[in-house]
Amino acid sequence: MIPGEILTDDGEHELNAGRATRSLVVANTGDRPVQVGSHYHFFEVNDALSFDRAAARGFRLNIAAGTAVRFEPGQTRTVELVALAGERAVYGFQGKVMGPL
């Protein structure tokens, strides 16, 4: 093994298997692009993004770790969200939760 090397099984791996998901339509109403990372609590993203925030509480983008989705000004797109796992507590971000979900 080489330091830092990652060994994986052959075939494909399903991300977030068995976790609750939901789809939301999101529109960027601002005049600047907004980029949202893979593990950002979607409920607390930039206020220029217009969508059903209550439905996004406790969810993040259902994309690979370390990636992001970019919303251009005026763009509307449908995104898939996945439920947060672990202790299901959220701290930081915009400070809108600061505790258990």
From Swiss-Prot:
Which superkingdom does the taxonomy of this entry point to? Answer: Bacteria
Q: Where in the cell is it found?
A: Cytoplasm
Identify the EC number(s): 3.5.1.5
Keyword Cytoplasm applies: yes
Q: Name one GO cellular component term.
A: urease complex
Q: Which UniProt keywords apply?
A: Cytoplasm, Hydrolase
Quick one: where is this thing mainly located?
cytoplasm
What InterPro entries does the entry give?
Answer: Urease_beta-like, Urease_betasu_sf, Urease_subunit
Tell me the GO molecular function terms: urease activity
Name the catalysed reactions.
Answer: urea + 2 H2O + H(+) = hydrogencarbonate + 2 NH4(+)
Q: Pathway involvement?
A: Nitrogen metabolism; urea degradation; CO(2) and NH(3) from urea (urease route): step 1/1
Q: Name one GO biological process term.
A: urea catabolic process
- UniProt subunit comment: Heterotrimer of UreA (gamma), UreB (beta) and UreC (alpha) subunits. Three heterotrimers associate to form the active enzyme.
Sequence similarity: Belongs to the urease beta subunit family.
Q: What is this protein called?
A: Urease subunit beta
Q: Which organism is it from?
A: Burkholderia cenocepacia (strain ATCC BAA-245 / DSM 16553 / LMG 16656 / NCTC 13227 / J2315 / CF5610) (Burkholderia cepacia (strain J2315))
